[in-house]
Amino acid sequence: METDNAQRIIGSTEYVEIAGIKNIPAKIDTGADSSAIWASDINMEADGTLVFSLFGKKSPLFTGKRIKTTDYRAKSIRSSHGDVQVRYRVKLPLELNGKNFETVFTLADRSKNNFPVLIGRRTIKGEFLVDTSKASVKPIHRPTTTIKLNQELKDNPQIFHHKYIKGKESK
């Protein structure tokens, strides 16, 4: 029988609940230090209250609910591409694999990412073990560039070859 102190085994992707929104696909990334969540319409009120919505209007997860908080910080984040951005950090309630707790998320535009939520190692440290052979969730987005390229290849292999391969050889 598992005790509250036992580490729970999770997969590389999991469904989570954040701020009352259920069945959110999340990527568990032990290579990322902190956790991030897709936030939109981020504004600062005159009194210093940070206001934002979770997810974007085109997301099926978007509820339109505005979250207001005065408990936030700013952090400089270096992306996996090497870009540096300043982002707000907020505490939000998280349910992961049956465990409820509050954790810090950076607010980011994750509209182009495969998962709207990234759970970093600080969030799972000491509480969870990641089994990379397990994945509860498939990505909600597919790389559109690859899809378009393969469709072009399928539609007309000769034009594709001339456009992307042969045309590049002479340059």
Regions of interest found by a model, annotated:
Residues 1-171:
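Pepsin/retropepsin-fold aspartyl endopeptidases
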